Structure formats: C-alpha cells, structure tokens
C-alpha cells in the first residue's frame, strides 16, 4: 500500500508507515479502515459496526449450537414466552437457558417438585399480575421459602403480558380497562376494533401486537427489570 502525493508533478508515491508529517506533527500513514458491513433493514448496529440484539446487548459471535443448562426460566403462558424470546432470545440461546411454560401459576410448585431446584440448577419464574396480597404473591412466597436461594419468583403488575408492550406501539395512549367478567384478551381486541370472536382472532391479535415490538425500548420498565434480574439469577458463574 502506498500514499500518493497529488500536489507534485509527476505524482509521487510513498510506502505507508511512519515518516510523514501533518500540520507540523509526525504521523504514521495507515491504510483506510474497511467500512462496517451495512445492516439489513431493522437491524441495530453500534458505531463500531457490531450488531446489537433486541435486548440492547452486543450480539455474540456465532459459536454454534449450545447445550441447554440445567438452570432455566419459567413463564406463565405462551404469549409471555414468545415476548421473552423475541427480545431476549439471542442472549438466552448464547447462555444455554431454556424458557418453559407453567400454563398458570397454580402449577408452579408441582413443576418445581419435578425439576428439583438447587443452587447450581436454578429456577427463575416470571409471574403475571403479582401484587401484594394476591394469590400469585402467596404462591411465590411459599416456593421461595421452600427452595431458598435456588428459586427466584418475580412478577410484573400487568394483568396480562400484552400490557407490558407500550400502548403507543398499537396507537393507544393507555391500555383499556377491561371490566371483571370479560376476558382481558377479548376485551382488549374489542377496544382496539380488531377481530375477537375466537381463539384464532386472539392468536392473530397477539401476533399483530408482538410484531410492533422492535427492541426492549418498546416494553414497559416494570417488565424489563424483572426479566433482566431473572436472567442474571440463572446465569451466575456456578449455575449449571
């Protein structure tokens, strides 16, 4: 590689390296840095050209499939799992942490009985609508006492995980208050003016909501902090 001096006639070329001066200071002439690869549409890239995941972390270098660790995270339902995977999926895959379904917090103790949590095989649990005095909080207290140090149960205040998506993403100022006795998913879709007659409509409505979530910035802080804390809990260095 050479540096060409175009002010001279004829044009003079010099090998790159030390020995050049710029504005009265000695410099070393180096070849230009390659431009960072252009990101595909929707992909976040740092100033240095590193890809950023939906959770805001640097994407790991591809190192092939991971063997799942014993430690894992449970969530109440399928929509919870899909949202967690959408935002934190790359981080969890790199750490070898599986996300599994409880199908309701009432099943938590039975699931943990089978799993057998220990300090090295940890269980992180995300619970919907865990507020003081609720059934959810009582179950959380019971399992946390029984498997102290091996189980961490955290909850968010939302009645349904849909409400953890910032309402502006679907054109609302706030999520609608659904009266008791009306299924919150049906009621929410009705308030949005979307189809809500059956489970197919609910599945399509959730898919539509999830598609508006680009990164962690589109989620409420009350969910973000809980998920990050659970990931930290199950990925301590000594966990299996």
Model-derived features: positions:
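Acidic, glycine-rich catalytic loops of TOPRIM or P-loop NTPase phosphate-binding modules used
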Residues: 60-124
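Short, small-residue-biased leader/transition segments that mark boundaries at the very start
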Residues: 2, 6-9
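Intrinsically disordered, low-complexity, charged/polar segments
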Residues: 10-54
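Charged phosphate-binding loop/patch that engages nucleotide di/tri-phosphates or the phosphate backbone
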Residues: 209-240
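Short, charged, intrinsically disordered terminal tails
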Residues: 47-58, 232-240
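Short, aromatic/basic amphipathic alpha-helical patches
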Residues: 113-115, 134-147
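Activity-critical C-terminal alpha-helical subdomain
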Residues: 142-217
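Short acidic, S/G/P-rich loop/turn micro-motifs used as interaction or catalytic elements
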Residues: 106-107, 130-134
């Amino acid at each position: 590689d050479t540096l060409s001096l175009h002010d001279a006639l004829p044009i003079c070329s010099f090998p790159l390296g030390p020995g050049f001066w710029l504005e009265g200071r000695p410099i070393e002439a180096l070849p230009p840095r390659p431009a960072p690869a252009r990101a595909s549409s929707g992909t976040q890239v740092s100033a240095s050209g590193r890809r950023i995941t939906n959770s805001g972390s640097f994407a790991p270098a591809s190192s092939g499939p991971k063997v799942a660790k014993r430690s894992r995270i449970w969530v109440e339902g399928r929509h919870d799992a899909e949202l967690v995977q959408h935002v934190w999926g790359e981080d969890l895959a790199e750490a070898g942490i599986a996300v599994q379904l409880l199908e309701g917090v009432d099943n938590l103790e039975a699931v943990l009985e089978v799993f057998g949590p220990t300090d090295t095989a940890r269980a992180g649990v995300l619970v919907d609508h865990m507020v003081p005095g609720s059934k959810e909080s009582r179950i959380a207290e019971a399992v946390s006492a029984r498997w102290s140090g091996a189980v961490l149960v955290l909850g968010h205040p939302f009645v349904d995980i849909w409400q953890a998506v910032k309402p502006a993403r679907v054109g609302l100022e706030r999520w609608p208050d659904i009266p008791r006795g009306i299924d919150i998913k049906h009621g929410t879709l009705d308030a949005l003016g979307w189809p809500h007659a059956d489970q197919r409509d609910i599945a399509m409505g959730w898919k539509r909501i999830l598609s508006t979530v680009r990164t962690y910035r589109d989620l409420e802080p009350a969910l973000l902090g809980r998920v990050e804390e659970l990931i930290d809990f199950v990925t301590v260095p000594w966990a299996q």
